[in-house]
Amino acid sequence: MDNYIKTALRATGEAWTVFKTSASTGQNPKLAFQQLRDKYKGTDVEGYVTDYTKICEEELPRIKNAETYMAQAKDVGNKVFQVFKANAKKVFTETMTDDDWNRIIKMASDIGYSNWDSEVKEYAKRYSAQIVWELDRQYQRLHKIKEDWWKFV
């Protein structure tokens, strides 16, 4: 679990660097994002990296003021990743209840629908939703592994 979080954090940092550089220089990030997707292909964070880099690619054309956008987007990212980190342990170690999932969804929604500048609103909504999807993806993956393990006992 700790490895997963560290890898996801590292991948987020790498994608964020490409995103930030592209926003401030206007360079096309498609190749750099594809290289990141290739780098993490076959790992536990493959889906997360694929989803996050696509969000970043689709957000770039919306950016009008890179400095303002990136400052707020960084704040969004930090808050979203805290929700992810705080709940990943529960996903990896326990059975999630409906109340747990509802709490996670509310935390992510609160971030996604906070009072962000209009330019950053879409990024906040999409990234906060993506974190919920990623937690669910990992939960489903681990639950299936558990089910498969019991078949051999």
Write out the residue ranges for each language-model feature.
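G/A/S/T/P/Q/N-biased, glycine-rich low-complexity segments that form flexible N-terminal tails, linkers
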Residues: 20, 35-38, 151
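Repeat-associated, polar segments at repeat-unit boundaries in modular proteins
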Residues: 42-74, 119-143
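Short acidic DE-rich linear segments
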Residues: 147-153
